[in-house]
Amino acid sequence: IGFWLESDRMLCLDFSSKSLEVQRGVVMEEFKQRCLNRPYGDTGHLLRPLVYKEHPYQWPTIGKELNHIAQATLQEVEDFFFSFYAPNNAILAVTGNITFEEAVRLAEKWFGPIPRRELKKRNLPAEPQQTEERRLTVERNVPIESLYMAFRMCDRMHPDYYAYDILSDILSNGRSSRLIQHLVHDRQIFSRSAPNPPFRAVP
């Protein structure tokens, strides 16, 4: 049923004002719940513009502001869909009690008839090298103060990416990590430390 659902969505998604309003309401509620109505929920919205000045990564996937979702038009949604949602621009992940051969057969059955689409070439601006510290102090009604720091690292295709990933674990993932031991247990100036190495296409 998963093959049928996803292929149906890719082939003949229902573009109508009614369906747009339903989905708009769902996404706006998700935005409020995740980003506006819980402590530290807007951290990503505040941190991204400090890290990225040119690249679109400065905008969260769910939207930068609530009115961006509220003002999205049906034509914009349709244009975006047909620009990126195509079998020649998709990755299919299949899990469960199924063989490789059966997965290929079902993929060809359900996605094979869907025509390829001419994809727009993405010409994204390069993020310039950061040469100075960027800092933002925000006052919020939250349980405790928090400090978020971001450092430039290589992109996910760089051969050093996995070394950075392991290094982040050594530094701050788990009770025996360096930062947990030094800042949480020994000096007791933080209550926790959590790494989050990004899996992104640009540094």
What is each stretch, according to the model?
Residues 32, 49, 119-176:
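His/Glu-based metal-binding/catalytic segments typifying zinc-dependent metallopeptidases
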Residues 1-119, 137, 155, 163, ...:
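Charge-rich, well-structured scaffold segments of protease-associated domains
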